Design a protein with these regions (language model features):
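Acidic, metal-coordinating catalytic segment for phosphate/diphosphate chemistry
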Residues: 1-23, 97-98
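Entry beta-strands of beta-propeller and related beta-repeat scaffolds
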Residues: 28-29
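A conserved beta-turn-beta hairpin within the catalytic core of GNAT-like acetyltransferases
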Residues: 37-40
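A short gly/proline-enriched turn/hairpin at secondary-structure junctions
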Residues: 43-44
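Unchanged
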Residues: 50-145
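Extracellular glycan/ECM-engagement signal in secreted proteins
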Residues: 148
């Protein structure tokens, strides 16, 4: 009789999500500072894919929900693969009722050719307390380490 250890029964579960890299006319990237206790928590717009929703639809929805951008953009690129990250252990139990160990995300590059006054982070359920346009190197120094790999 074969016995299966409880460790091998555990299959890592990742929440399906999307991330959005919004580029302005100067090729800088939108980044927002989250409403978290950790004031250094900056990130690009991202979120989960709803049941029955396509990833591209989720990306556009998340962008609108988090930045207010509804027009003057075009999707330039979709990542070929899912990008995975594991949450730190203390967050795995706290977020999503402990159902997931992390996220797998499909990323989209968006060309935003509108003006800054079209961006409104004071949305129905705001995610960001402030935002700015940044370079790739600035972003890598600002985002939480477990998301930068």
């Amino acid at each position: 009789m074969n016995s299966i250890s409880s460790d091998s029964k555990k299959i890592k579960r990742y929440r399906r999500g999307v991330g959005v890299i919004i580029l302005n006319k100067k090729r800088k990237i939108f980044i927002g500072q989250r409403f978290d206790k950790d004031k250094a928590a900056w990130q690009m717009p991202q979120g989960g894919i709803d049941r029955g929703e396509k990833a591209i639809e989720a990306a556009k929805r998340e962008m609108q929900e988090e930045t207010g951008i509804k027009k003057n953009f075009r999707v330039m690129h979709e990542s070929n693969d899912w990008h995975y990250y594991d949450l730190p252990m203390h967050l795995q139990k706290k977020l999503w009722r402990g159902r997931y160990v992390g996220q797998k995300q499909r990323w989209y590059v968006i060309d935003f050719y509108g003006s800054d006054n079209e961006i409104n982070i004071k949305t129905k359920r705001p995610e960001f307390q402030t935002w700015r346009w940044s370079t790739k190197n600035e972003i890598l120094s600002l985002i939480v380490p477990f998301k930068s790999k």
